[in-house]
Amino acid sequence: MTGRVTSVRGPVLDIRVEGPLPAIGDVVEVGSLPVVAEIQAHLGAADVRAIALHSTQGIARGETVRTTGGPLRVPTGPAVLGRLLDVAGRPADLGPPIPAGAPRAPILHPAPPLAAQDARFQVFSTGIKVLDLLAPLAQGGKTAMFGGAGVGKTVLVMELIRAMVSGYDGISVFAGVGERSREGHEMLGEMKASGVLDRTVLVYGQMNEPPGARWRVPLTALTIAEGFRDGEGRNVLLLIDNVFRFVQAGAEVSGLLGRMPSRVGYQPTLETEVAALQERIASVGRASVTAIEAVYVPADDFTDPAVTAISAHVDSTVVLSRQLAAEGIYPAIDPLATTSVLLDPAVVGEEHARVAGRLKEAIEHYHELRDVIALLGIEELGREEQLMVGRARKLQRFLTQPFFVAAAYTGMEGRSVPVAETVQGCAAILGGECDDWDEGSLYMIGTLAEARAREEARRRKGAA
């Protein structure tokens, strides 16, 4: 079927169709490029309204429109590995075209039925001490990383990609949603340099692209991830940076379509759109899609409707703290605000859960005493409280570590630490084994054995 463009208002296209109307969610191709647009409303017996997924520059009234008969279909499978794609699955890396025979799948379809999903909790080990100890990630689950601008979300996402490739022989699919083009270019270059690009698919809808592209890019990336899970039986790590921009793009689309906004100007379908994305992320059979979602928190306001809508769907919540980043604690993960449903003795074991609980108690007690220390000095505290404060500060520094993906900037080789060694190290600090150590010996290291060697070297140097 064909039609003609009758109105162009930015990314909004009104189209008169010859024949039966295309269904809501179907895509049409406009012009010779072609520009892909998704049907969003039926205006009359022969008129529809669509949101363009590409720039409409050069599109005019009277332009020819071709219907496709279904939702947007994107390529999946081995043909897309190592490639940078746009929202429609077209190469954006100046490489060769995707082979015509590559399998394709629609980006709009229901979540897997409940009976097919694997609800068992299996831990995804990252080698990042603070995550594995305090916020174990679930295979087939969803983790949200909340934080404002400049606190380290993107670096943490890249380190998790490296962990999936090196530790699980898995595939990573990265969705760049509404972020800076410069950051996307840097990530592509760093992945090439680190050797993980051939096991990764990048799907970008950057901030300079129309709202329709930014709105649908997470679904394109998720569809590619589902293709590896269902078609190849591979474990997939889906990383979305930034899922808040997906919500923001949905609000733009809603406004362009003339819908009445809801609280704080968000779209009235906010909860529905977030759920449609999140509920498709699951384990099916022996393979899983595990999602790590960076969430920008506007003005550091965790009561923002978009933030609360996203947090309702996740298994683990990782909160990045601007104060910790200012103190040089990296990764700047707040141990008190970070939570996970997997931090349960039945899942991680009694010792792990006990040490994590004691660590949180120690750091919380230290935070309660910080004002007193700032006013009167630590000498005014009792002996036991001084020891507890010292241990809490040492625990904070022990949970820092250099990342592999940041080695070029920090000059420090990355570390990946098994969770058993993390638990053992924290237990030793809580038990007083490191009370007479310098805090610097525990900063930016891997295991406690490495910290012990650094402390012994410091003492030898002091004795000399």
UniProtKB/Swiss-Prot annotation:
Pfam families: ATP-synt_ab, ATP-synt_ab_N, ATP-synt_VA_C
Gene Ontology cellular component list: plasma membrane; proton-transporting ATP synthase complex
Residues noted as binding ATP in the record, renumbered to the chain: G147, G148, A149, G150, V151, G152, K153, T154
Keywords (A to Z) from UniProt: ATP synthesis, ATP-binding, Cell inner membrane, Cell membrane, CF(1), Hydrogen ion transport, Ion transport, Membrane, Nucleotide-binding, Plasmid, Translocase, Transport
Membrane topology: Peripheral membrane protein
Localization (cell): Cell inner membrane
Main location per the UniProt record: membrane
Catalytic activity: ATP + H2O + 4 H(+)(in) = ADP + phosphate + 5 H(+)(out)
SMART domains linked: AAA (SM00382)
EC number: 7.1.2.2
Molecular function as annotated in GO: ATP binding; ATP hydrolysis activity; proton-transporting ATP synthase activity, rotational mechanism
Subunit structure: F-type ATPases have 2 components, CF(1) - the catalytic core - and CF(0) - the membrane proton channel. CF(1) has five subunits: alpha(3), beta(3), gamma(1), delta(1), epsilon(1). CF(0) has four main subunits: a(1), b(1), b'(1) and c(9-12).
Described purpose of this protein according to its UniProt entry: Produces ATP from ADP in the presence of a proton gradient across the membrane. The catalytic sites are hosted primarily by the beta subunits.
Family from the record: Belongs to the ATPase alpha/beta chains family.
HAMAP family, per the entry: ATP_synth_beta_bact
Full protein name: ATP synthase subunit beta 2
Species of origin: Cereibacter sphaeroides (strain ATCC 17023 / DSM 158 / JCM 6121 / CCUG 31486 / LMG 2827 / NBRC 12203 / NCIMB 8253 / ATH 2.4.1.)
